[in-house]
């Protein structure tokens, strides 16, 4: 089977490397960045390149698996551009961390039977093909979501992909996915950016000289790809706003406790410590 990866960034590049390492599948890639393609070819991370996406309509790529591994908004545009392959022998999946906008496109096209949504829960604050790894997905969870219209053979091909990368498959519907990740991933990144904004206001003070490991770890998320996270914040706006409202309410509760009732803050922090130990 041929696997065509669209987008050779951290995720796409890592999929390619791990497939080359673990399987005998033929791995091809398309990327608008010729340097990324050249590096992947020179490093034997892919077997060949795709010059343009129209090539994928040829018989040469029948029964292949296409993995869209670009930032979320670009993924939506690419998916639309591949509409001629909907309901074909080609299997299409993605890696986006937002699912409902993708699902809406599928419904718009009468729910094609060959498209399965994927979200590997793996990554790094370092982006780009140059930071890709041949073990990024090892032992990591991957969310897989398929509409009822999808044929079982296409689901199996996507499952084979993630099993080849030694990932753990979890099935989850798009609505639940976007709600959960607004809290578990998108909000923490937003808070990291907010802390950095606060530090920017204090740039006359060299805070980093007086910081411990937790400080750097907290800010690490803000080193992630601005393009990708701008897309995520925008596309998951409703869920993120709800999560952010709750977060702000809790910040205000902590602020009030600090100012008005020092004993209460101790009790609150103790209960939160217990909750964390029992759940996370």
Which sequence ranges carry the predicted segments?
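NAD(P)+-binding Rossmann beta1-loop-alpha1 motif at the extreme N-terminus of oxidoreductases
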Residues: 1-61, 65
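Rossmann-like NAD(P)(H) cofactor-binding subdomain of soluble oxidoreductases
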Residues: 76-130
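Rossmann-like NAD(P)-binding element
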Residues: 54-86, 90-91
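Interdomain hinge/lid region at the active-site interface
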Residues: 205-272
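Residues at the starts of beta-strands that form the adenosine-phosphate
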Residues: 2, 26, 114, 141, ...
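Short secondary-structure boundary/capping segments
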Residues: 58, 107, 133-135
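Short beta->alpha hinge that forms the Motif I/post-I loop of the SAM-binding pocket
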Residues: 32-33, 70, 95
